[in-house]
Amino acid sequence: MIKKLMTAAALLTMVGTASSATLYTTGVLDFNKTTKGSYLGKIGAAVPVTVLKKQGSLSYVRISGWTLAEYPSMIFAEPDAAEYFGKNCEWIAPKPGTDVAMMIAMAHELESSGKVDREFIRKYTVGYDKFIAYVLGKTDGVAKTPAWAEKICGVKADAIKRLAHLMREKRSMLMGGWGIQRAQHGEQVHWMMVVLAAMCGHIGQPGGGFGFSYHYSNGGAATSMAPALGGISANPKGGSEGLSWVGESLATIPLARFTDCFLNPGKTIDYNGKKITYPDIRLVFWSGGNPFAQQEDTNGLIKAWKRPETTIVCDTVWTASARFADIVLPACTSLERVDITSIGSYSNLGYVAMQQAIEPQYESHSDFWIYRELSKKMGFEKEFTEGLDEMGWIRRFYENAAKEARVNGLEMPSFEEFWARGYVLFPVDQDARRYNYLGDFRRNPIVNPLGTESGKIEIFSKKIESYKYDDCPAHPTWMEPTEWLGAKMAEEYPFALLTSKSRYRLHSQLDSTASNLFANVEDREPVWIHPDAAKKLGLKSGDVAKVTSRRGSALAGVIVTDRIRPDTVVIHHGGWYSPEEPGEEGSLDVHGCNNVLTIDIPSSKLSCGNVANSTQVKIERWDDELEPIMAHVQPKTERADD
């Protein structure tokens, strides 16, 4: 079936992520719907064969088999060639952070050659006239031609022209990951991707258009008929806080700006059309994350982490973040407690009874037990538990879902039967198998409007225009990042750093396990470097290099590969921070934590997202003694009851 559906298809990839649903909405493509003769365009940074396999995904099985097939002719346009299997693949490697310039030039080519689908633009979009005036240079005197883009992105003008015509001549599908939105001006990539798809006119057709959500949880698989599982109430009964506080409080801040918040209480910033004033954070309770792996500029974070009076981390292992905490609450792993989960957040193909395999080890407790005890100390245990224990909550989630399913004509087994069997599977609705993203919108945009102010695809946004942001104009625009290969600083820091996901981890999870032994070089996180660059630096695979940015330095094991641009390196995200001098700002990280290197500025005033992929570094051979990796060794602690 895969061969039949994918014959003569092509995969065009650029690198990206969805950021602003107010402009165009996001969606998931069912891989079964990709039609014969289509160009399936993946605007990447979420490689399905890397990220979906971590979910045990049916989509991964389809994709890996599909990419191994001889039929698709795939064109990937991104700085690093990740796990691509098709022997007919073509790789185009733009400079990191320049995808917008390349796509704008493709738009220029379509417009100047008369290939734009005018009827689609007229019927389904707003603001094209203002955008195309910018593209043609009528607003700033600079025509955004393929030759113009070549000087920025490093891709030949003829290749840009060819890509534009390939996309237009056959039905094209552009797939977007969640990667290069993590860059300065990151919103522009996906906005421009949608504009390009609109110019081609394939949106809403089977196998055509765009989509963004393929990075996990069965993205690309058809959705079942089952309802989603609920969760513990965010707004406790009898209480006035909870969800309402989170939604309305002026103390809510963009997560990526928390370091700035800690360092600058009282500072006012722009965020998504509003002004936000940072609160004075005096206590931090961090659960379910690892900021010393995920937050940019680790040395800046060390300074910020010292500002609150108390920091508490609740986790299952001694992460880098737990090592910086004043108090650590040891939580159970999923093997030591009960729970319930769905099979695929997108596809929801079934529920699994997560039954306890072993008793809680040592002094650990379940998250529910920890929060219940904290609630008891604070005087609202009854409001938190609502009279239920853990199994009571699981039963409530399941039985509420069963009631909703019954309304929709789907009978589920009793909770007792479900728990004894361990799982329940749901049929996939036939309409879901035939689902065509934005097909209803294409058939009738008046009856089926988008969730934008105009109800259409907003190539130009009046709302964003009203914000008057200097870093996020009202239509897709090429803007130079602070750090990139075209900046003056690249003379001293000549390599662009990419922080892609590792195939051996899930974010920073599993870094302390045997899985990472397959990836590490001399116990260090690897740095991918091109053979030409390695030769100039006197490096070979198996060496250790010191990688330095304006913010810090980290050691990394060298892997020489031609799957990267000569002016670009990759250190995968998630290596645990292991400093030479623990707790000291500016200490050399000896393990390869890439966020020691990255810059901590907002992607723009619109989203205030992180910019992990907008960093320049320099590299030198490391011949000194290698310090042991202490990130995976239990630190010295004091018991709270001693």
Cite the ranges covered by each PLM segment:
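SH3/SH3-like (including bacterial SH3b) beta-barrel domains
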Residues: 33-45
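Long, contiguous, secondary-structure-rich segments that constitute the structural scaffold
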Residues: 361, 367-421, 508, 514-528, ...
